[in-house]
Amino acid sequence: MDKTEKVEHPFTVFTLGRICYQKNPTLFNEIAEKLPEIRFVWIGDGEFREELKSKNIEITGWADRATAIRYAVNADVFLLPSRWEGLPISLLESMYMKKICVVSNVIGNRDVIKSRLNGFVCDTLEDYVQAIQCAKDNKVGNMAEKAYLNILEQFNTRVMSMEYQNIYENRQ
């Protein structure tokens, strides 16, 4: 299978990165427990691995980039319930792959995702569950396409370098 080839799969929610306090594996687990019919995948590993107890969670362990991309391509929703973020590259990459993105209401996430326009910004466990259920029930319209277009328009290297240039030129 080519690393970007989509294959038939059950509805899948994924995240990737170190399983640590910042990434909020406890909340990830609670969300999975509320949606037992949905497959959850955590691409990565870490010291908080034991927090992921729900039977519908698969932990891949550390994966090379090609394997991680294969998991991501064959998933439907990117879930990022972090306690804090900077500018999460995994979120930008997921938007580029046209995934429905469900994220916590923290700086970084909410700077990129405009709730119900190009993804979902969540405050409560119930918000996450409802957002994922909307995605599963295909009640998201062209949200993934809007996220993809946001990446092309706002987060490409040309636009970002122009923004940095403006910052430097306007410094007093």
For each of these PLM feature ranges, what is it?
Residues 6-23, 29-33, 40-41:
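Conserved donor-binding/catalytic core segment of Leloir-type glycosyltransferases
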Residues 50-66:
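Nucleotide-activated donor-binding/catalytic signature segment of Leloir-type glycosyltransferases, i.e.
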Residues 62, 70-75:
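Short alpha-helical donor nucleotide-sugar binding micro-motif in glycosyltransferases
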Residues 83:
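Aromatic "clamp/platform" in nucleotide-sugar-dependent glycosyltransferases that forms part
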Residues 115-126, 134-139:
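Conserved acidic donor-binding segment of nucleotide-sugar-dependent glycosyltransferases
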Residues 141-169:
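A charged, aromatic-enriched C-terminal amphipathic alpha-helix characteristic of glycosyltransferases
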